[in-house]
Amino acid sequence: MGMGTFTTDESDKHEESYLSLGLTVSQSKKNNTEYPKVLLLLAAYLDRSVQKNEDLLDSNKIKDSSTIFHGHRAPDLSIKLYAERIFKYSECSPSCFVLALIYMERYLQQPHVYMTSLSVHRLLITSVVVAAKFTDDAFFNNAFYARVGGISTVEMNRLELDLLFNLDFRLKVDLETFGSYCLQLEKETMVLVIDRPIQQVHGVNSTKDLSRNSSIDESCKSELMRYSSQALQGCS
């Protein structure tokens, strides 16, 4: 069952969560500049997880194993802005970000593997790409996703394969699990009210500086227009 766009169903006990997170907005009707709430809450959740893990690493309470997702330094772009960038250019359904969180947490079940500022951005873009390919009706190629994420196509391919093999290609998520993650993200609303504002993650990786690289944005926009033109020609 695809989860790209959810429809109203009074029998679905998670319907309110879907509405709250902005998962019911059809991608074809997404014509405003607002981002679905799921992006903000996911970013807050990932920010807190990263901070917690790095505090434990600094105190030598845990030991992190380097993975293919680890960069040499952290990107200047915050997780929130990175998630918004992915959503803006990939045109994936909002539900892909919930699936991405599920895939990320499954990946992190490996011993001594923790999400930090050196790995969170790559984990996020890769998980969203895998989710979009699995659940959405249309998606781009990895060369395009690589430009969106600020990495090379070769690296995008390798990251995707690594994630898939570590997940044992088990991408299907039942509605109960999906709904529970939606509820988990909803709880971040209270955390944002009580806790500090989302902090920018400074410092990581060899991902390109997307915050100041307008040429990458123009490339993505140009590619989007080309894909849209081809799609229209195919329908004529």
From Swiss-Prot:
Any one biological process term the GO annotation gives: cell division
UniProt xrefs under InterPro entries: Cyclin-like_sf, Cyclin_P/U, Cyclin_PHO80-like
Origin: domain of life: Eukaryota
Keywords: Cell cycle, Cell division, Cyclin
Residues annotated as transmembrane: none
MF annotations from Gene Ontology: protein kinase binding
Family annotation (SUPFAM superfamilies): Cyclin-like
Pfam families, sorted: Cyclin
Keyword Cell cycle in annotation: yes
Family: Belongs to the cyclin family. Cyclin U/P subfamily.
Protein name, entry field: Cyclin-P3-1
Organism: Oryza sativa subsp. japonica
